[in-house]
Regions:
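Short helix-boundary/re-entrant hairpin motifs in multi-pass inner-membrane proteins
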Residues: 1, 8, 18-28, 64, ...
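Alpha-helical transmembrane segments
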Residues: 1, 45-53, 81-84, 123-132, ...
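Internal transmembrane alpha-helices of multipass membrane proteins
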Residues: 1-65, 84-86, 114-117, 149-150, ...
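Juxtamembrane/interfacial segments at transmembrane-helix boundaries in multi-pass membrane proteins
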Residues: 45, 52, 70, 86-142, ...
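Predominantly late transmembrane helices and immediately cytosolic-facing juxtamembrane segments
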Residues: 278, 282, 465-502, 572-603
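Amphipathic regulatory helices of Ca2+-sensor modules
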Residues: 313-315, 341-358, 380-393
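Primarily EF-hand calcium-binding motifs
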Residues: 323-339, 361-382
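Aromatic-capped, Gly/Pro-kinked transmembrane alpha-helices
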Residues: 352, 530-572, 590-715
Length: 715
């Protein structure tokens, strides 16, 4: 589906001309990396495909490498995830040692082989592997790379957040389940399970808080991904704890078996629901950005439809202007044969000598054609002068037009798009409701399961009270920032002329949105089919006789739970996620559409409620938006700043020591050998007198020495 979306997105933007072949090659390799990792039958193959995805993410995030921000984001993602990968490699090495040189799943997950392993050593190995998952899935404290990864094309963002990369870390942790569920490790790995849940809870709240103040549409979704993945980590932590502390194998333990299977299944079901919803949200956001960008382009470029000048000509014109050199002077300097005309070779050498470009012949041809006005295959002075003058005038005009850079991703440049992009608005509404955990939609069933299972563990182990409170608080926070995003984009009046001229999306983009919207709305069907019952050895014991039985079972546990604590908990979570968070957003953002603008019938209740609440309360959040907390959240809680400072101090201190070692030890050794060689050669050179008598004497002495050595050996 994302590939289909990419065709409509990438092929209609002129900026991607002559580079789409590279995009699709890297894109398909990225997908292959994740597929290979899931199909791998050993941790070794998992690691190989894991690294392949790391390479592809670097290439795709930095796809527009000519932009400094994209190049920086690619390096940042690559290096940050490499930190986690170092720990993963050490953990795998420990696992390889513990299991006598085996990393195959069939061997390491065998109960008899697990029984031979020291529990403390296995806990350390799995803990180090978990750090690798933290880096890959952008969890605290290795989370800083994910927001910057939005520099890549939107299809890449959709793929990273929905189907690959960040999900790889979750898959790795889920793959550890047999270790935690082994009877031979009973009660030995509960501390690691708590750490997994605590990291997840911390990241869930932190990322949701930062999403509150984001104005970039894709970055809101990036922090949403970080937060929702943290939910899954928390759910996995709770499930792994239950698997490690409950006797759930064999006859007589059916209840415990059901608890473990459903806890593990809820986390994986949320991974599925999140993938569907987030893939749809990123594709919908890409459609919005695509159309906003095109609307801005048409508004500001309708008055000059000329093709942009080749960048080499722009650089040449700028070069001559800085050198204060006329076209005639430049022409004379490169007309090597004084023919009064410049051929392709002379022009190519001129660009090379000016350090502008060293182009192959096939790229020189369109450049020559841009200057060669009479079409004779050569350039004369008037043609060059006229072309360079035109290029400078275009640059000056473009600079005047773009003295304020327009940001097509900023929600501050959107608003009121529900009437202009109804299909996209519908997809984003359904996806947002799923992420929020709105009743009966996909994400509701899995998120409620994660919250319930985390609290189930918290009642048994007080340490889990922290992640349990985090996921409950995160439910309300998710409701706020997802509602804020939709309202700022689709409700209210257009924020500027560009938003007022946005048009609908093309078919290539609409089709995946239709399909993913349907799947997301089908969450109740999937839940009724037993999608939460994923675990080894489950064998369908908890699956229901019919779809109706499954539906009634899920509805009863969600809204009429027999346990009074979980009955109250489900409604508290629902109150925070579906009422408090969205209600606060409705009172602060959006509003009614402009007069004359109409929305689809299914939007009418949402927009009417938004207009009524905002019109009644008129809350002003300007003071809060300028507070110290808001500033800190806008700066990502200064993690990047502190990391940069720490790295600078560590790297700078290390570099000085390395420089001393380099100059004193490495260079010193080489220079000592060099000096010794020079001194020895000087002394040997003194023996070269040019006298035949001296040479005969040295030959005789050498012969006697050799004779003496041979005589000694023989004797």
């Amino acid at each position: 589906l994302i590939n289909s979306f990419a065709i409509g997105y990438m092929n209609t933007d002129p900026i991607n001309d002559n580079r789409n072949h590279r995009f699709y090659a890297e894109f398909v390799l990225f997908c292959s990396g994740m597929l290979g990792m899931v199909l791998a039958d050993s941790f070794l193959w998992l690691f190989i495909f894991w690294e392949l995805m790391g390479l592809c993410s670097y290439l795709l995030i930095g796809f527009y490498y000519e932009r400094p921000s994209a190049a920086y984001a690619a390096k940042k993602a690559f290096l940050t995830t490499r930190v986690g990968d170092v720990f993963l490699m050490v953990g795998l090495a420990m696992l390889w040692t513990l299991f006598d040189g085996h990393l195959d799943y069939a061997y390491v997950f065998n109960d008899d082989n697990i029984a031979k392993v020291d529990p403390a050593s296995l806990a350390w190995a799995l803990g180090l592997m978990f750090i690798g998952a933290v880096g890959k899935s952008a969890q605290f404290p290795l989370h800083v790379w994910l927001p910057d990864a939005m520099e890549g094309p939107t299809p890449v963002s959709a793929l990273i957040h929905a189907a690959t990369m960040v999900n790889a870390g979750l898959y790795l942790v889920a793959r550890m389940f047999p270790f935690f569920g082994s009877e031979h490790m009973f009660g030995q790995l509960d501390d690691l399970a708590f750490i997994i849940a605590a990291i997840g809870g911390t990241t869930a709240v932190m990322a949701a808080a930062i999403a509150f103040v984001q104005t970039d549409l894709k970055k809101v979704l990036a922090y949403s991904t970080m937060s929702q993945l943290a939910y899954i980590f928390t759910g996995l932590g709770a499930a792994l704890y239950l698997a490690n502390t409950l006797h759930w194998h064999g006859a007589g333990h059916e209840v415990e078996h059901g608890i473990v299977v459903v806890a593990f299944g809820a986390a994986l079901f949320h991974l599925f629901n999140h993938a569907m919803a987030k893939g749809m949200l990123f594709m919908a956001s890409g459609a919005v950005i695509h159309e906003v960008h095109h609307a801005h382009h048409h508004l500001h470029h309708d008055d000059h439809h000329h093709e942009p000048s080749p960048k080499e000509l722009v650089m040449l014109a700028t070069y001559l202007k800085e050198k204060d050199q006329s076209a005639f002077e430049f022409f004379t300097s490169i007309d090597l044969d004084d023919s009064g005309e410049i051929d392709t070779y002379e022009f190519k050498e001129a660009l090379k000598s000016a350090e502008i470009a060293d182009l192959p012949p096939w790229e020189m041809e369109p450049l020559m054609n841009a200057i060669d006005l009479d079409g004779n295959g050569k350039i004369n002075v008037p043609e060059l002068d006229l072309t360079l003058t035109r290029v400078l005038l275009e640059e000056a005009h473009d600079h005047d037009d773009h003295h304020e850079e327009f940001d097509a991703q900023s929600m501050d440049n959107m608003g009121g798009l529900a009437s202009k992009m109804p299909i996209t608005a519908t997809a984003m509404l359904v996806g947002s409701l799923s992420i929020m955990g709105f009743p009966l939609i996909g994400g509701f069933w899995s998120k409620e399961g994660i919250i319930a299972n985390t609290w189930r563990v918290a009642l048994d182990d007080p340490r889990f009270m922290y992640p349990a409170l985090c996921v409950l608080l995160g439910a309300g926070m998710t409701g706020f920032y997802m509602s804020r995003m939709w309202l700022k984009t689709f409700a209210g009046s257009p924020k500027g002329e560009v938003a007022a001229h946005v048009g609908p999306t093309n078919t290539w983009i609409k089709t995946p949105l239709f399909i993913l919207t349907f799947i997301t709305l089908s969450g109740i069907i999937l839940a009724s089919m037993g999608f939460t019952h994923w675990a080894p050895e489950s064998k369908g014991e908890l699956l229901h006789d019919s779809l109706l039985d499954g539906f009634l079972y899920e509805m009863e546990h969600a809204f009429a739970n027999h346990d009074s604590f979980f009955f109250i908990l489900s409604y508290v979570a629902l109150f925070f996620g579906a009422i408090v968070g969205p209600g606060l957003a409705l009172s602060l953002y959006g509003g009614k559409l402009d007069d004359g603008e109409t929305a689809k019938p299914w939007f009418t209740p949402v927009l009417a409620l938004n207009a009524a609440i905002k019109g009644r309360y008129h809350w002003d959040n300007s003071a809060l938006s300028e507070s110290t907390l808001a500033t800190a959240l806008s700066n990502r809680l200064y993690f990047d700043h502190y990391y940069d400072m720490a790295m600078l101090k560590i790297v700078a201190a290390f570099s000085f020591k390395a420089a001393e070692a380099d100059s004193g030890v490495i260079d010193g050794t080489i220079k000592t050998i060099e000096r010794t060689s020079q001194q020895l050669s000087t002394k040997l050179r003194a023996l070269t007198t040019g006298s035949a008598r001296d040479y005969i004497l040295m030959a005789a002495i050498g012969t006697l020495v050799l004779f003496g050595l041979i005589w000694g050996v023989v004797a």
